[in-house]
A protein has these predicted regions:
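A short SAM/SAH-binding and catalytic strip from SAM-dependent methyltransferases
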Residues: 183, 234-249
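S-adenosyl-L-methionine
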Residues: 205-236, 246
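Conserved Class I S-adenosyl-L-methionine-dependent methyltransferase catalytic core
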Residues: 58-165
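Conserved SAM-binding motif I beta-strand of class I
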Residues: 193-198
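Conserved SAM-binding loop of SAM-dependent methyltransferases across substrates and taxa
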Residues: 178-190
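Conserved beta-strand signature within the Rossmann-like core of class I S-adenosyl-L-methionine
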Residues: 263-275
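Conserved class I S-adenosyl-L-methionine
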Residues: 167-179
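Conserved SAM/SAH-binding beta-strand->alpha-helix loop
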Residues: 200-202
Length: 329
């Protein structure tokens, strides 16, 4: 996930301005809700989004909009800010898989690309992958804003986080986006299993097939973390840049997710700049948001500062070993 513009919350139905009477009871009618959901899912841009998320947003917009047309437009706007703004091009599963397997029509290799390619080739878990496959993987990671922003410090990011942990044999990547494409650069245990979830069924199909291609066991599933938080028990859960998105959908959703995750270690991260590259005090804002998230919980936390990302490693069970490091790196 990625830095997102702050969404204005819908006007409360009891305080709608004159001439803007909310649909109120009518808006809560199942038929009205279904009409909004059907209209949203009929749009090519959103047809692969989990219907549960669309329904959640539709119910809220129907409660404060005058009619179906306004509710549909407002729901689309919210979905764009939550989901649509971060993928540079529409997910084309077959074309992307062909690109991985053929490695054709890729941009020239940069010095930073070459360093990443060398690092991946040194990883025994993916030593069987050829350079063109890895180049295509890097290219595709750049098609999603969140993973593109992490590319300049990708090696440092995972080396730093995993150095603080005991051997990791299972990972759950919630709201994964294209982050599972970074598996070749993760120092996972030789027998590691990887689980991923996201609200986009097309993306999840691609991630599942990518994992099969590289020979990593696990599973990729469509899951709406606002209505069904969590996942299988794992050693490490990744919640990268998803907390601000969850909080925009429903206040308290990020804390509920972290609490629900069945993992002794959870990595929560936040963006420190907008899509346009502006900082606007986001680091301080999200640090306060994280402090509220863990308030009152008996968890240990390590803080890491990367060039474009603020990360917090949570240890839920203090009996487990980890290596403490400086608060920033």
């Amino acid at each position: 996930r990625h830095a997102v513009p702050v969404l204005a919350m819908p006007e409360d139905a009891e305080h709608s301005p004159p001439g803007r009477k909310a649909l109120s009871d009518a808006g809560r009618d199942a038929g009205q809700i279904d009409a909004v959901v059907d209209a949203i899912l009929a749009a090519p841009k959103y047809r692969s989004i989990a219907p549960t998320l669309v329904r959640t947003l539709a119910v809220r917009e129907l409660a404060v909009r005058r009619n179906l047309r306004e509710a549909i437009k407002a729901t689309k706007n919210r979905l764009h800010q939550v989901v649509g703004a971060y993928v540079e091009q529409r997910i084309d599963v077959e074309r992307w898989l062909t690109l991985l397997q053929s490695g054709t029509a890729l941009p020239p290799v940069t010095p930073s690309d070459e360093a990443l390619l060398q690092a991946a080739r040194a990883n025994p878990r993916v030593a069987h992958l050829d350079a063109s496959f890895l180049r295509a993987t890097l290219y595709l990671m750049a098609q999603h804003a969140s993973t593109r922003e992490r590319l300049p410090f990708l090696l440092h990011f995972y080396a730093t986080i995993y150095a603080a942990l005991p051997p990791i044999r299972s990972v759950l990547d919630v709201g994964c986006g294209l982050n599972p494409l970074a598996i070749p650069w993760m120092p996972l245990a030789d027998d590691a299993v990887y689980y991923a979830s996201d609200i986009d069924s097309a993306l999840i199909e691609f991630i599942g097939r990518f994992m099969a291609l590289i020979g990593i066991p696990g599973n990729a599933e469509v899951r709406d973390q606002t209505t069904d938080p969590g996942g299988p028990p794992v050693d490490l859960a990744l919640a990268l840049k998803i907390a601000p998105v969850l909080e925009q959908i429903e206040r308290g959703a990020a804390a509920r997710l972290v609490e629900t995750l069945d993992a002794p270690f959870v990595l929560v991260s936040y963006p420190v700049q907008t899509l346009g590259g502006r900082r606007k005090g986001m680091g301080a804002t999200y640090e306060r948001q994280f402090e509220a998230l863990v308030a009152g919980r008996q968890w240990d936390v390590q803080r890491f500062v990367f060039p474009g990302e603020l990360a917090f490693l949570i240890r839920k069970d203090s009996r487990l070993p980890w290596k403490s490091s400086a608060s920033s790196c």
